[in-house]
From Swiss-Prot:
<dbReference type="InterPro" id="IPR016899">
    <property type="entry name" value="mRNA_G-N7_MeTrfase_euk"/>
</dbReference>
<feature type="binding site">
    <location>
        <position position="62"/>
    </location>
    <ligand>
        <name>S-adenosyl-L-methionine</name>
    </ligand>
</feature>
<dbReference type="GO" id="GO:0004482">
    <property type="term" value="F:mRNA 5'-cap (guanine-N7-)-methyltransferase activity"/>
</dbReference>
<feature type="site" description="mRNA cap binding">
    <location>
        <position position="142"/>
    </location>
</feature>
<comment type="similarity">
    <text>Belongs to the class I-like SAM-binding methyltransferase superfamily. mRNA cap 0 methyltransferase family.</text>
</comment>
<feature type="binding site">
    <location>
        <position position="37"/>
    </location>
    <ligand>
        <name>S-adenosyl-L-methionine</name>
    </ligand>
</feature>
<keyword id="KW-0808">Transferase</keyword>
<keyword id="KW-0694">RNA-binding</keyword>
<dbReference type="GO" id="GO:0006370">
    <property type="term" value="P:7-methylguanosine mRNA capping"/>
</dbReference>
<dbReference type="InterPro" id="IPR029063">
    <property type="entry name" value="SAM-dependent_MTases_sf"/>
</dbReference>
<keyword id="KW-0949">S-adenosyl-L-methionine</keyword>
<feature type="site" description="mRNA cap binding">
    <location>
        <position position="65"/>
    </location>
</feature>
<dbReference type="InterPro" id="IPR039753">
    <property type="entry name" value="RG7MT1"/>
</dbReference>
<feature type="binding site">
    <location>
        <position position="143"/>
    </location>
    <ligand>
        <name>S-adenosyl-L-methionine</name>
    </ligand>
</feature>
<feature type="domain" description="mRNA cap 0 methyltransferase">
    <location>
        <begin position="24"/>
        <end position="331"/>
    </location>
</feature>
<feature type="compositionally biased region" description="Basic and acidic residues">
    <location>
        <begin position="335"/>
        <end position="347"/>
    </location>
</feature>
<dbReference type="Pfam" id="PF03291">
    <property type="entry name" value="mRNA_G-N7_MeTrfase"/>
</dbReference>
Length: 378
């Protein structure tokens, strides 16, 4: 799968209007994803502020149509570089940025770059000379894991110009969870009412045969067929980033992230409509099985408590649990405990969703260690 094919796919995706988004089967899931990104950026900004920076210089790599531009404005960013392989997406991002000049306050400076970050040196195209305080890559890094060279080039572009103490955040499909799901499906497939995951080479699903690079799968969401994607095992991502003096601050599966951020972010979650009210007459899911957990919660409430809860349908929840959220920081030159600077975010590993998923992760750790002993790159 070439970068040109990825670009063509995203260039041809129809820009959905507000009404289309409201009528989508995954309306609440998309809003939840957006809320998770907001909480992630908010926590990252705390770390950036602790590094002595109030108005960060930001790289939004694989930025798509610029869906996070408003978030960068809220952070008080000084300058944002938006880079993506799809030229139409960059054009739409730039148009979105231009509308922000109508805001009653000054907004950040920006540069929009069309670049294949898996092949080109992004630094050659960046106009500003300042290093980045914050880098963000949302739902896109895994495309670079088509092969080792592409992944290494992408990660170098992502963090190569990050200042000491700078932060790299992102969201990523959980490769171990996906492998578990398709292994336990039929003929390499997992499907529910909102998503379908297909692993191309079923014979590779036997233990230990899924490659570290080039493991192709297809993820269709809400009847929209996506272009082929590639598994990016988080343990491998961590290993490659450590070569760039990056250290892991945190990694959570989305279910864990929602639990961690629910209390501090509840008001924003409600305003962003990240949860569906149950019960109501127009539920997005059409079967009772989609809301068994919500119904059980309602039944457990006392008689004097309002009988409404916020929820996601079962299918949306299963899809959202296929993702991870992460944060890294570029090591400083001084020897000190960097984690002590960020009490708000604990360094954790994802809670295993089941024993098989955990075993898959452990197996991949072993394979990465073997690769390190016999490196293909000097």
């Amino acid at each position: 799968m070439s970068a040109a094919e990825v670009a063509d796919h995203y260039n041809n995706v129809r820009q959905a209007g507000i009404q289309d988004r409201k009528e989508s089967r995954i309306f609440f899931m998309r809003n939840m994803n957006n809320w998770i990104k907001s909480q992630l950026i908010n926590d990252a900004m705390k770390l950036v502020n602790e590094n002595g920076v109030k108005s960060p210089v930001v790289l939004d790599i694989a930025c798509g149509k610029g869906g996070d531009l408003r978030k960068w404005d809220i952070t008080g960013a000084k300058h944002v570089v938006m880079a993506d392989v799809a030229d139409v997406s960059i054009q739409q991002a730039e148009e979105r940025y231009k509308t922000m000049h109508k805001y009653p306050h000054d907004i950040f400076g920006a540069q929009f770059i069309v670049a294949d970050c898996t092949k080109e040196n992004l630094d050659d195209k960046i106009e500003i000379k300042e290093p980045f305080d914050l880098v963000s890559c949302q739902f896109a890094m895994h495309y670079s894991f088509v092969d080792e060279d592409s992944a290494r080039t992408f990660l170098k572009n992502a963090v190569g110009k990050l200042k000491l103490g700078g932060v790299f955040i992102g969201t990523l499909p959980d490769a171990d969870r996906i492998v578990w799901a398709v292994r336990n499906g039929t003929e390499g497939k997992f499907a529910n009412d909102v998503c379908k995951i297909t692993y191309e080479k079923v014979d590779e699903l036997s233990e230990g045969n899924v490659p570290l690079f080039g493991a192709k799968f297809h993820f269709s969401l809400d009847e929209q067929v996506n272009c082929p994607e590639f598994l990016a095992y988080f343990s491998l991502v961590k290993h490659l980033l450590e070569e760039h003096d990056m250290e892991l601050l945190f990694v959570h599966n989305f279910a864990e992230a929602i639990t961690n951020w629910l209390v501090p972010g509840r008001r924003l979650l409600e305003s962003m409509k990240g949860l569906e009210t149950f019960p109501n007459r127009n539920l997005s899911g059409k079967t009772d099985e989609e809301y068994l957990e919500a119904k059980a919660k309602i039944d457990s409430l006392g008689d004097n408590v309002p009988k409404f809860v916020g929820t996601l349908s079962k299918s949306e929840w299963e899809a959202i649990c296929m993702y991870l959220v992460f944060g890294f920081r570029k090591k400083k030159t001084t020897e000190k405990n960097l984690e002590s600077e960020a009490p708000e975010i604990k360094k954790v590993t994802p809670v295993p969703l089941n024993e098989d998923t955990d075993k898959t992760a452990e197996k991949n750790e072993e394979r990465i260690e073997e690769k390190e002993e016999n490196p293909s790159h000097c």
